[in-house]
């Protein structure tokens, strides 16, 4: 969605953890934004890292018009999850390596500051997945599929993907999958990615999944090292509600950043949320040019 967006006059900034070397870059970015009439507030944990004052995340999210991350895609994804409930636009300034989701490099910010102040930027909506964990101890599988009133023990969101992975180093994980409460398949594999289009260029692509245009509303199912060659990646509409049982102890990994244990007595219910994560980009950004650059498509080898 281009132009006619709210002008940005105050931004909160979060830095990649354990990166005190970002202090110089942050101060340069702060100066550029201040010169454009945009106030900059640093998050308190980031501030402690570089010995500057900051405010806690809730203050940032409630007082600022937008949030900027300084780091790579991982820093941006972490910030998006934290900012999701506040419905704030977010932008990534890339100091990492690949940077599919980040908007620009620090040295290019000066070309974009006037656009921020006038509201001339692109605001893209990214699908977000929610996982609910239900304990089904001593209850039959079929009965629990119909138990709509059960309270989840945990509720989580993912920007890129949820990964159900084997708990031990050896062996496979066996995962029963249902779509809209109907048994669909048993995956025998090292792990199963339940991903978003934005995450299709992350772990999903390494596991043989398709690249999906990031602003589509799809859910990706991609098995990792499946036991059977017929277990292929699957792209679904966002309307489906998915449920998974791991038949042995397993791990649920969220965006590669958090991990929880799941037991054979746990049911993992995953579906797309109607609310989206909002990412800001310069109005000139072209996704296919980004793909071409990052994957080096069209180059002679």
Curated annotation (Swiss-Prot):
Gene3D superfamilies: Probable inorganic polyphosphate/atp-NAD kinase, domain 1 (3.40.50.10330), Probable inorganic polyphosphate/atp-NAD kinase, domain 2 (2.60.200.30). It is an enzyme of class 2 (transferase). InterPro entries: ATP-NAD_kinase_N (IPR017438), ATP-NAD_kinase_PpnK-typ_C (IPR017437), NAD/diacylglycerol_kinase_sf (IPR016064), NADK (IPR002504). Its cofactor is a divalent metal cation. It is found in: Cytoplasm. Keywords: ATP-binding, Cytoplasm, Kinase, NAD, NADP, Nucleotide-binding, Transferase. It catalyses: NAD(+) + ATP = ADP + NADP(+) + H(+). Its EC number is 2.7.1.23. The active site is at 73 (proton acceptor). Coiled coil: none annotated. NAD(+) binds at residues 73-74, 160-161, 188, 190, 198, 201-206, 225, 257. One of its GO terms (biological process) is NAD metabolic process. GO terms for cellular component: cytoplasm. GO terms for molecular function: ATP binding; metal ion binding; NAD binding; NAD+ kinase activity. Involved in the regulation of the intracellular balance of NAD and NADP, and is a key enzyme in the biosynthesis of NADP. Catalyzes specifically the phosphorylation on 2'-hydroxyl of the adenosine moiety of NAD to yield NADP. Belongs to the NAD kinase family. HAMAP family: NAD_kinase. PANTHER family: NAD KINASE. This is NAD kinase.
């Amino acid at each position: 969605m281009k132009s006619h967006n709210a002008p940005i006059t105050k931004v909160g900034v979060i830095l990649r953890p354990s990166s005190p070397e970002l202090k110089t870059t942050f101060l340069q970015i702060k100066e550029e934004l201040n010169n454009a009439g945009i106030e900059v507030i640093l998050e308190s944990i980031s501030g402690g890292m570089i010995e500057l004052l900051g405010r806690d995340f809730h203050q940032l999210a409630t007082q600022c018009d937008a949030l900027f991350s300084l780091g790579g895609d991982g820093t941006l994804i972490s910030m998006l999850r934290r900012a999701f409930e506040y419905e704030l636009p977010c932008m990534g300034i890339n100091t990492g390596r690949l940077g599919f989701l980040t908007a620009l490099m620090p040295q290019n910010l000066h070309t974009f500051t006037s656009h921020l102040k006038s509201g001339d930027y692109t605001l893209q909506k990214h699908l977000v997945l929610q996982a609910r964990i239900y304990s089904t101890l001593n209850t039959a599988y079929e009965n629990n599929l119909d138990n709509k009133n059960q309270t989840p023990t945990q509720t989580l969101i993912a920007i890129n993907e949820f990964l159900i992975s084997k708990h031990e180093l050896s062996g496979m994980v066996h995962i029963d999958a249902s779509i809209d409460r109907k048994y669909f398949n048993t995956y025998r594999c090292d792990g199963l990615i339940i991903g978003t289009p934005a995450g299709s260029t992350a772990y999903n692509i390494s596991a043989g999944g398709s690249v999906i245009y990031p602003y589509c509303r799809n859910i990706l199912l991609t098995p990792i090292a499946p036991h059977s060659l017929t277990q292929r990646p699957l792209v679904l509409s966002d309307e489906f509600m998915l449920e998974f049982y791991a038949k042995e102890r397993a791990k649920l990994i969220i965006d590669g950043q958090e991990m929880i244990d799941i037991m054979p007595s746990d049911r993992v219910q995953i579906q797309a949320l109607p609310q989206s994560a909002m990412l800001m980009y310069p109005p000139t950004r072209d996704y296919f040019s980004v793909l071409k650059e990052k994957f080096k498509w069209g180059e002679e080898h």
